[in-house]
Amino acid sequence: MLSSYAFLKIREIILKQDQLHLYDSLNQLFNAYDIDWFAKSRELALSWDEVQKLKQEKLVTLGAHTKHHYNLKALPDVSDVIDEVEYGYKILENKADLHPVVFAYPFGSINEADKREFKALSSMSDKFELAVRACGGPVTNLSTDYFALPRIMLTEDYTYLTLLRYKKICVI
């Protein structure tokens, strides 16, 4: 299993790449180590059949993401952000007949999604009701921007006791 440290180091490398040429950069990086990164993606990602099964579950909400998983804040123009989000949305519409109302920012910290990206998502309120970022913490009365709601990124470092800490904070 990939440790949190290794995950964060790989994440750091990815975030430093030119986002519009990310796939070329990753291909060069992983090919240098003879790693088939698409095989790992196929192993870990949901199949469209699995998406259809989850779609039938009452306790499951399937949300949207982007097409390429770019660091949105590093994209040169807000139109690039909107294109990424819309393309990801259209994939879900076409492949799974899904019309998600929740969006999750790739990476999701303030370094990868900030006011420009929140505003871009809020301009798509005909599709989305809210968007979440991985900045940790519960939704409280301080979380007033529905296109910048916090979520907890779970890793093997999170224990049940860690999660209970969030339960003690007032949630709206």
Residue ranges of predicted features:
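C-terminal active-site subregion of NodB/CE4 polysaccharide deacetylases
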Residues: 67, 73-172
